[in-house]
Swiss-Prot record:
Quaternary structure annotation from Swiss-Prot or TrEMBL: Heterooligomer composed of large and small subunits.
GO biological process terms held by the UniProt record: DNA catabolic process
Organism: Yersinia enterocolitica serotype O:8 / biotype 1B (strain NCTC 13174 / 8081)
Gene: xseB
Compartment(s) where it occurs, according to its Swiss-Prot or TrEMBL record: Cytoplasm
Name of the molecule in the record: Exodeoxyribonuclease 7 small subunit
Record-linked HAMAP family: Exonuc_7_S (MF_00337)
Family from the record: Belongs to the XseB family.
The EC number(s) this enzyme carries: 3.1.11.6
Xref: Pfam families: Exonuc_VII_S
Amino acid sequence: MPKKAASPETKAASFETSLSELEQIVTRLESGELPLEEALNEFERGVQLARIGQQTLLQAEQRVQVLLSDDVDAPLTPFTPDTE
């Protein structure tokens, strides 16, 4: 059975939930009270959540670029952030 695509509301809720979980992980890691193995597991989960969030934000930015484009047929070019 194929997976259904998540609705924009579900994606937003998932993004917010992931961000909240990531903030909690950072707080636990910053406390310095976790045993090493647990801290490594938390760090790994945090990296996963950060990557997912980054991808979600990139997709949202691309959608905004498409919506603001004057030319409907203009190709979407990959986003390249300015690095300073």
